[in-house]
């Protein structure tokens, strides 16, 4: 059945705005003129503001349409057994690369709400799996008699089989299966023992498995329509301990006046410049001005990513690839880098002194064509503009993720 006219109109308007935003981002990436950059950023900020407004209106319209469609739904289990099981997916796209870092309490794959409307206590077992890709996630709960304690919500995140997801190089369809069973007990000489299992719900839900080299920026919660930010997990793609990264760091040291990179025991700017010069002169990397890609009408935003060692071996990088490579080299040099994510783009930052909260920025796509100072100026202007935009109420317009914080506060470790 086609979507309602209002919804279609909003989607079309959003589609056109996204195309306009994409064109502006391409112009922003291509310009190295500070004055032209400021004008383009101002226009881009206005377009992003309109996009945010349309997205909010569209989400509210879609939720209203969905509520109307659900008005006459009847849950059979609550009428027949007094037990209601509501299964809800929390993400339609499974980010296989960083899935092992997710927490079921904050980023579950699905949730199951159990409601006991009878006067008896109930014991219920919930099992969920991604068919062919995960182990079973099993949770058993006790539901109190009807009342406030008779409702429980279970959050599930089945563990993926590594050997099953490693071959995933393309977006792949999969099925999530959820089984809700009541454990029926009998008594014998004051002892309880299980006599049967009664199936309360058996649900199959379609999902998408993201490719292993796809880094998630955000996923849409199918229930609320809200975007769940996952950009912090870009930190997993910062891999300072890889042999290829360490070997290139030794080359970078050769570009430093003291022939070594000593972290915060030495001048920070000269070390960042040495890494910049090494990438410019020794890596032979072609920097591609491609955008962080997503479709706002889909349920995931992300970007295919080359790991730092792949950038060095393939001699190619886009904005996020170059950012992750530069951040890996900075972290390997015992400095404190950060990944900066703004609409359609990413660049690198580093802390001027340890734990100071004062940052320098650099546009990595300019490494092959411009000087260190020019790349710093453009990176700084972009950071200043988008940080001000974010201060207006939309935090997604400027995300600065210090790698030290990601490692220590979020437990996000390198993928390799």
Tell where the protein language model's regions lie, with residue ranges:
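Amphipathic alpha-helical coiled-coil segments
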Residues: 24, 40-66
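Long, low-complexity, intrinsically disordered N-terminal extensions of eukaryotic proteins, enriched
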Residues: 34, 54, 61, 108-110, ...
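Short, solvent-exposed segments of well-ordered alpha helices
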Residues: 8-11, 38, 310-317
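A structural boundary/capping signal
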Residues: 74-416
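Coiled-coil termination/hinge junctions
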Residues: 64-75
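Short, charge/polar-rich alpha-helical segments
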Residues: 1-19
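Amphipathic alpha-helix face/heptad-repeat signature
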Residues: 10-13, 43, 168-170, 315
């Amino acid at each position: 059945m086609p979507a309602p006219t209002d919804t279609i109109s909003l989607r079309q308007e959003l589609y056109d705005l996204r195309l306009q935003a994409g064109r502006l981002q391409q112009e922003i990436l291509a310009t190295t003129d500070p004055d032209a950059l400021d004008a383009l950023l101002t226009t881009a900020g206005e377009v992003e503001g309109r996009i945010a407004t349309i997205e909010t209106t569209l989400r509210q319209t879609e939720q209203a349409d969905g509520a109307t469609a659900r008005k006459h739904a009847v849950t059979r289990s609550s009428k027949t057994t007094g037990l209601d099981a509501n299964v809800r997916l929390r993400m339609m796209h499974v980010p296989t690369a960083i899935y092992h870092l997710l927490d079921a309490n904050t980023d579950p794959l699905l949730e199951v709400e159990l409601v006991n409307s009878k006067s008896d206590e109930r014991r219920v077992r919930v099992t969920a799996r991604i068919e062919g890709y995960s182990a079973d996630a099993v949770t058993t709960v006790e539901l109190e008699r009807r009342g406030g304690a008779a409702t429980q919500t279970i959050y599930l995140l089945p563990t993926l089989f590594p050997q099953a997801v490693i071959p995933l190089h393309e977006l792949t369809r999969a099925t999530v299966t959820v089984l809700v069973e009541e454990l029926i007990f009998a008594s014998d000489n004051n002892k309880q023992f299980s006599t049967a299992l009664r199936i309360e719900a058996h649900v199959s839900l379609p999902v998408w498995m993201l490719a292993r080299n796809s880094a998630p920026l955000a996923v849409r919660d199918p229930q609320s329509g809200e975007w769940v930010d996952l950009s912090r997990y870009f930190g997993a793609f910062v891999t300072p301990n890889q042999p290829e990264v360490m070997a290139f760091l030794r080359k970078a040291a050769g570009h430093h006046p003291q022939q070594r990179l000593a972290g915060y025991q030495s001048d920070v700017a000269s070390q960042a410049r040495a890494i910049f010069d090494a990438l410019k002169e020794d890596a032979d990397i072609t920097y591609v001005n491609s955008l962080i890609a997503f479709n706002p009408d889909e349920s995931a935003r992300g970007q295919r990513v080359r790991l730092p060692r792949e950038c060095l071996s393939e001699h190619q990088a886009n904005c996020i690839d170059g950012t992750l490579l530069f951040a890996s080299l900075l972290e390997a040099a015992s400095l404190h880098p950060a990944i900066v994510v703004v609409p359609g783009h990413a660049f690198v930052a580093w802390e001027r002194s340890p734990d100071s909260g004062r940052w320098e920025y650099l546009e990595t796509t300019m490494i092959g064509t411009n000087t260190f100072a020019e790349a710093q100026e453009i990176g700084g202007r972009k950071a200043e503009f988008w940080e001000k935009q974010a201060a207006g109420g939309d935090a997604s317009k400027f995300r600065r993720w210090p790698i030290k914080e990601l490692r220590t506060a979020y437990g996000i470790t390198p993928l390799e």
